[in-house]
A protein has these predicted regions:
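Radical SAM enzyme core and accessory elements
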Residues: 1-7, 49-54, 58, 374-476
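Acidic, low-complexity intrinsically disordered segments
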Residues: 1-231
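Conserved strand-turn element in the central/C-terminal portion of the radical SAM core barrel
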Residues: 38-41, 272-275, 300-309, 321-346, ...
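Conserved, mostly hydrophobic/aromatic
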Residues: 148, 238, 354, 373
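Radical SAM [4Fe-4S] cluster-binding motif and immediate context
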Residues: 170-332, 352
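Non-cysteine beta-strand/loop elements that form the S-adenosyl-L-methionine
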Residues: 61-64, 125, 282-300, 362-368
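Hydrophobic residues within beta-strands of alpha/beta enzymes
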Residues: 60, 97, 120, 236-238, ...
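Catalytic cores of alpha/beta
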Residues: 108-115, 281, 341-355
Length: 476
């Protein structure tokens, strides 16, 4: 038996999309699969004890979606909880433990070593997990499992990442309690592709999902949405890095949803790059059921867009917002303030531009999470010794370790960058302001983890992207 455990206990709860894909893919190879969902358990320790008293798996797989919450100043790190979970499982079962997931794939070696797991899978888990199960049954062949981290003669070995170019994923989505997830989480995720060919300064998606976009067949995506609709789930959100990269695939997905008239039955939200985005794609998305877009704007300063390696220009962002207005799609722009080279002037330029648009809301995050292997590390190394960099923000002591939540805020924004940004926003309620760094500061940002207002709104019946729900709360 293969036991798959959802470890994500963030609230509102998000259904474990990747775990569902892995479970169905494993079943297709003849493996008996059982799922323990700690995401919905009120007492996870009791759930673990009860489960392993009744089951004796051959392999235990843990999905690890988030290494941390990626927000400063909260900087919540979830790896210690994962380590505690592995320790508890060791007491209850002798089965080997394998860890996978998007968050895991960014820090695969570090996590395997830190939590003392037997195996890890970097990249796509659908084929690799089943391959590992059968390799264990044979007692050999670990070197052939794509993405596998494994030990041989006491040495941790790492196979090439599991990023198959032919991306085909299961569509049934029937291994977790979607009704409860929908009632408590307000939406359900789905994927149209994985990977990203862009090299934005800060982004870890190419590290976790692959350096090129790998697309699913549009018919497969539509089949999955129909399966979720049959379970009563009619509000969805893409899990893609950017839905419109590549544009022709986004159009093909929309065309298939329109052909099946799914746009009349489902509401969905998406993350998009600012370009490519035109009237044809906007129209197609709206007809296919899209009701909200979150653009990765980052900045509205030419200097900062160049710093972040964004290909769009300021006027492209304004045009994207206007197109959403014209077709009736609600629109959010996420900003990333405080990167290398940010000044009072560039931040003011960005905020003034967004205030002059007809955007529904703006996320004004003020700090950049630093991931190893990204351009952010290279940029900071060019500034001198990282240990002495005055822009670093962290809650831990000792040597700088990007495995732990470590952020950068340009020193040019002063000693209280959140206050500076709030002054620039000047009370415009469309902006989710950054939270100040003081311990007793009121939370004003759009960190969704453990957001009591959001949890209460969903419990009361709100459905949709979390920024859209919070926006509606502000407008009441």
């Amino acid at each position: 038996m293969l036991t798959l455990i959802n470890t994500n206990r963030m609230a509102p709860p998000i259904s474990p999309v990747g775990l569902e894909y892995v479970a169905e893919a494993a079943r297709r190879t003849g493996i008996d699969v059982s799922v323990l969902d700690l995401g919905l358990s009120p007492a996870p320790d009791d759930a673990l004890r009860d489960y392993f008293a009744r089951h004796t798996p051959s392999l235990i797989g843990l999905s690890f979606r988030n290494v941390d919450d990626c927000f400063w100043p909260s900087a919540q790190w979830f790896v210690p909880e994962l380590r505690e979970l592995v320790t508890r499982i060791r007491v209850l079962s002798d089965a080997p433990v394998v860890i996978g997931g998007v968050g895991f794939s960014i820090f695969a070696e570090r996590i395997v070593q830190h939590v003392d797991a037997d195996f890890g899978i970097r990249g796509d888990g659908e084929g690799a997990t089943a391959a590992l199960y059968w390799a264990l049954a044979r007692g050999r062949g670990f070197e052939k499992v794509q993405g596998l981290l494994w030990r041989s003669d006491g040495v941790l070995r790492s196979n090439p990442p599991a990023w198959p170019s032919d991306l085909s994923l299961p569509t049934r989505r029937d291994v977790v309690d979607h009704a409860t997830y929908f009632a408590r989480g307000g939406q359900c995720g789905f994927e149209t592709k994985r990977g990203c060919g862009r090299r934005c300064l800060y982004c870890a998606d190419p590290l976790s999902k692959g350096p090129v976009a790998r697309v699913r067949r549009p018919a497969e995506v539509a089949d999955e949405i129909e399966s979720l609709l049959a379970q009563g789930i009619d509000v969805l959100h893409t899990c893609d890095a950017e839905f419109n990269l590549p544009r022709d695939h986004a159009m093909a997905v929309c065309d298939e949803l329109i052909r099946r008239r799914l746009g009349e039955r489902v509401r969905w939200y998406a993350y998009l790059a600012v370009t490519p985005f035109d009237r044809e794609l906007a129209d197609a998305m709206r007809r296919a059921g899209c009701v909200g877009i979150n653009f990765t704007g980052d900045a509205a300063s030419g200097l900062m867009l160049n710093t972040y390696r964004q290909p769009h220009r300021v006027q492209d962002l304004g045009r994207a917002v206007q197109l959403c207005r014209e077709v009736g799609i609600r629109v959010m722009v996420d900003l990333l303030l405080g990167g290398p080279g940010e000044t009072h002037e560039t931040a003011a330029e960005t905020i003034a531009f967004l205030k002059g648009t007809d955007v529904d809301c703006v996320g004004a995050a003020c700090a950049v999470r630093i991931y190893p292997g990204t351009g952010m590390v290279e940029a900071l190394e060019r500034q001198g010794a990282i240990e002495q960099n005055p822009g670093l923000r962290r809650k831990y002591t000792g040597p700088v370790d990007f495995f732990r939540p470590t952020f950068y805020v340009s020193p040019a924004l002063g000693s209280d960058p959140a206050a500076l940004v709030k002054d620039l926003i000047a009370g415009d309620e469309r902006f989710f302001e950054p939270t100040a760094e003081q311990p007793d500061a009121e939370t004003t940002d759009h960190n969704y983890n453990d957001n009591a207002d959001l949890v209460d709104a969903i419990r009361a019946g709100a459905r949709g992207a979390y920024w859209d729900i919070l926006l509606d709360l502000r407008r009441r």
